[in-house]
From Swiss-Prot:
Its EC number is 3.4.24.-. The keyword Plastid does not apply. This is ATP-dependent zinc metalloprotease FtsH 1. The lineage of its organism: Bacteria, Pseudomonadati, Thermomicrobiota, Thermomicrobia, Sphaerobacterales. Binds 1 zinc ion per subunit. Pfam families: AAA, AAA_lid_3, Peptidase_M41. Acts as a processive, ATP-dependent zinc metallopeptidase for both cytoplasmic and membrane proteins. Plays a role in the quality control of integral membrane proteins. One of its GO terms (cellular component) is plasma membrane. One of its GO terms (biological process) is protein catabolic process. Its cofactor is Zn(2+). InterPro entries: AAA+_ATPase, AAA_lid_3, ATPase_AAA_core, ATPase_AAA_CS, FtsH, P-loop_NTPase, Peptidase_M41, Peptidase_M41-like. The active site is at 426. In the central section; belongs to the AAA ATPase family. GO terms for molecular function: ATP binding; ATP hydrolysis activity; ATP-dependent peptidase activity; metalloendopeptidase activity; zinc ion binding.
Amino acid sequence: MAENKWLRNGFVWIVLIIAVVALWVTFMKDGGSAREENFADVAADIRQGRVARIVMTEGSNDIQVQYIGEEEPRSSRLPPDVNIYQALEQYGLSGADVEIRVNPASQWGNWLSALTFILPTLFLIGIVIFMMRQAQGTNNQAISFGKSRARMFTGNKPTVTFADVAGVEEAKEELVEVVEFLKYPDKFASLGARIPRGVLLVGPPGTGKTLLSRAVAGEAGVPFFSISGSEFVEMFVGVGASRVRDLFDQAKRNAPCIVFIDEIDAVGRQRGAGLGGSHDEREQTLNQILVEMDGFDSTTNVIVIAATNRPDVLDPALLRPGRFDRQVVLDRPDIAGRRAILEVHSRGKPLESDVDLEELARQTPGFSGADLENLVNEAAILAARRNKKTIGRRELTEAIDRVIAGPERKSRVLSEREKLMTAYHEAGHALVARMLPHADPVHKVSIVARGMMGGYTRVLPEEDRFFWTKKQFEDQLAVFMGGHVAEELVFQEISTGAANDIERATNLARRMVTEYGMSKTLGPLAFGRKEELVFLGREINEQRNYSDEVAYMIDQEIRSLIDTAYKRAHEILSQHMDKLEAIAMLLMEAETIDGHELEALFDEPRPRPQLVGPPVTRPAALAHKTEEADRGGERSPHPQPHPSPTMRPQPAS
């Protein structure tokens, strides 16, 4: 391949050299830029004695006329079919009237004359040949569409190992066995174990699916083929299936090895009903993947690792055992995982002594591994921008704000009234969050514009949360209403600054009613059917599966939740107007305050949630009570279930 490329480039250079030589020969033949005279004028000048000599080449009609007092000769041309002497006689002159020098003909002159015609011809022929080769290359390129575009990485020099992956310990444990399968296949074959055909990595974007697959290849020390699912399908029919065959042929020749298909949902979506033919090419590609992963030839030592963040749209045939035997879930890391990830990404970066990675991990709930890597990188960029040699807490804290809300918009200048309204708006959020027991503690309040926001109030949960309760949602709704209510109380008007808060509150209230079953009137029911459309690759489309009367009740429940949240926020802010003003004035002065500065304004501690639940009975005590009841001949009756509010018993008529 490299040799053909060199020959092709060399041919282009040859054509260019021929063109340059042809131009040079043409220029030399024209004799440069000498002044040209008519021979009749030259004869008149000879008669007047102004010409010193005439120089010419034997066999040529071109002459050089040297005038007296001039350094450069002038060029002229003899009449056709006569020599210099005959031409002079035509004007009544002879060779005695002027000095004539005749130089012998040079062989180079004949060559130059020949090249004048040969080189342009060769140049045109070269252009034709070049165009023919380009056309041939286009045909070869069309044929090469069927070749796989997978990039191969050898396992001789692993760049990524399990030591570079943190925060996904369970996933690493699952994939350690894959490494052992590749390193010691006889260990499992002796027990009759079948080597897993494929591993599917499932998780949100940025959780380390691609990094983990590269670490598996680095640990196993085997070749690693990497390709994206979108690289299989092209505009030509059959290209996708051909590329799949070529990819697995390369993998079998380099076995044992790993084939990594990123974003497999691009070709692995569930096959439709076969009507219309809009997805036939993608389905042919998927069918070929199914055959290659578990067809008649199932003895090769090739393991397929695929990654996706849409497992719900994948074809069931792709997920069955024998193809993707294991599905490894990579979720966003918890606080311990975030700390481990921060330690990995802070290697080689000079951190100041006051940097606490544990505290940093606590401040970044919901961050993925990619977010944390970006955070550390942003902090390093900020430190370099400030000409510092180390990365401090200030840079890391600001990097968190940049990742969450975007960079500061220092060019955005607010009027004094808008700035004051923003301060009271954010103070309303912060005060309501501080006074409600089930709301998350306030970590930072700022009126500095970032991204699309004029200001923001950042709350920070005290621990990682995997479930939400109704009381937490209700307090969250009240916090959303805090900014809107504060503007109304202080300025007796409302602004567009609360638009996003109202939208988020409405969406949360709707989900509480229609998805989470948190409505007393409607009960624990889910409303809205998610229909899976086969023609769109199982795209989700929500349709109403309830009556207009129920839709009205849903709207009423949403309005009730929002109204209750509004009243709670209004009550809190009305009772603590002095605190609201103090927070707003502090924001006007400092623009940004943290949770400790906010707590310093209060004398009483922050209200804590009261845990209410049944007394915990240990299994042994429960068994003892059951035995006593059996001996007494009585069993403790089960409590009767309360009727659902929507299913109240009707009185007998």
